[in-house]
């Protein structure tokens, strides 16, 4: 444990929250470095952190800077992450190398879960999880997020899986791995930009307090792995399923034609979707993350009250 702590650096706010047993919610950093252009990425990150504070919890955005796993970012850290041109996108396989080489790294869903667990943080808010890519039966392109969800004990609040993915196969994978996927006020898996996907959920709850009960019970039963809380984008910000699917299909063809795959595929596709929707998808992305941040903070606060 002493060896681990030499690699971890807490922001002043997070350090104080840990000392005072306050509820903490982790945030990923790939959305800042690879998911949105500057300065929207900084504005979004600071707004989301404030939403978490407004709902009674402390935000902890996670990134790797100068050989340290930063749990909570100071403003100068955020600027480095948002403006650097060579930020590595870090998943489980890359974590040791990026820390050892003292590079700047942005954490994916998988790595944010790992680092949150190292720091004792049980809740993590993101836009959408990764999953099984379309055509994975030929390419085997499956996000490491799914494997991480099967073994790391962090509850992830998201707007479902990213809509560029094969959602039925993603759900099959999570079911095989024993990962609970719980809809928040919905019986259908949300698909990031849209509230509906056509994929039905077996579990749905209506309140943050009920999610807190499930989180704590799972923990007390020593069941390995995370929980996915699927929180649909608010009605007023959702895009239509037919509209976004047509645009995604165009973007997928462009990626294939340009030979873009692996970890580069998601940023390319999301960038193309922003371009083809004239920025509507970027606005929707920001709103769904804000919505997830409010719910994540409420769940963390509800769990803290039960302890």
Swiss-Prot record:
Q: Where does Mn(2+) bind?
A: 141
User: Any note on cofactor binding?
Assistant: Binds 1 Mn(2+) ion per subunit.
Q: Which cofactor does it need?
A: Mn(2+)
The GO biological-process annotations, alphabetized, read as: nucleobase catabolic process
> What is the active site of this protein?
28 (proton donor), 162 (nucleophile)
GO MF: hydrolase activity, acting on glycosyl bonds; metal ion binding; pseudouridylate synthase activity
Q: What is its EC number?
A: 4.2.1.70
Task: Please provide the record's keywords in A-Z order.
Answer: Glycosidase, Hydrolase, Lyase, Manganese, Metal-binding
What are the GO cellular component annotations? cytoplasm
Xref: Pfam families: Indigoidine_A
Q: Which PANTHER family match?
A: CARBOHYDRATE KINASE PFKB DOMAIN-CONTAINING PROTEIN (PTHR42909:SF1), ZGC:136858 (PTHR42909)
What is the protein's quaternary organization?
Homotrimer.
User: Which protein family is named in the record?
Assistant: Belongs to the pseudouridine-5'-phosphate glycosidase family.
Q: What function does the entry list?
A: Catalyzes the reversible cleavage of pseudouridine 5'-phosphate (PsiMP) to ribose 5-phosphate and uracil. Functions biologically in the cleavage direction, as part of a pseudouridine degradation pathway.
This protein's name: Pseudouridine-5'-phosphate glycosidase
Q: Which organism is it from?
A: Staphylococcus aureus (strain MW2)
């Amino acid at each position: 444990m002493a060896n681990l702590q030499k690699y971890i650096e807490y922001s002043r706010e997070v350090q104080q929250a840990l000392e005072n047993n306050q509820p903490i919610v982790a945030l990923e950093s790939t959305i800042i470095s690879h998911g949105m252009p500057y300065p929207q990425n900084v504005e979004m990150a600071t707004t989301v952190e404030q939403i978490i504070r407004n709902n009674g919890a402390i935000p902890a955005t996670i990134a790797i800077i100068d050989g340290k796993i930063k749990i909570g970012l100071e403003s100068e850290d955020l600027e480095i992450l948002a403006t650097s041109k060579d930020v590595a996108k870090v998943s489980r396989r890359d974590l040791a190398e990026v820390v050892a080489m003292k590079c700047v790294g942005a954490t994916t869903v998988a790595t944010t879960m790992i680092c949150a667990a190292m720091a004792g943080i049980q809740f993590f808010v993101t836009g959408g999880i990764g999953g099984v890519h379309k055509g994975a039966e030929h390419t085997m392109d499956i996000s490491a997020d799914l494997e991480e969800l099967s073994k790391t004990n962090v509850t992830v609040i998201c707007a479902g899986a990213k809509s560029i993915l094969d959602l039925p196969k993603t759900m099959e994978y999570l079911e095989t791995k024993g990962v609970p996927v719980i809809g928040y006020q919905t019986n259908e898996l949300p698909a990031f930009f849209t509230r509906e996907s056509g994929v039905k959920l077996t579990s749905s709850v209506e309140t943050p307090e009920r999610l807190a009960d499930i989180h704590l019970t799972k923990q007390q039963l020593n069941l390995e792995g995370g929980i996915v809380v699927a929180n649909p984008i608010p009605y007023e910000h959702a895009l239509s399923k037919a509209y976004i699917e047509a645009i995604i299909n165009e973007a997928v063809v462009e990626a294939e034609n340009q030979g873009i795959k692996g970890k580069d595929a998601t940023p390319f596709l999301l960038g193309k979707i922003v371009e083809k929707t004239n920025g509507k998808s970027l606005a929707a992305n920001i709103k769904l993350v804000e919505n997830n941040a409010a719910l994540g903070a409420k769940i963390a606060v509800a769990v803290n009250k039960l302890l």
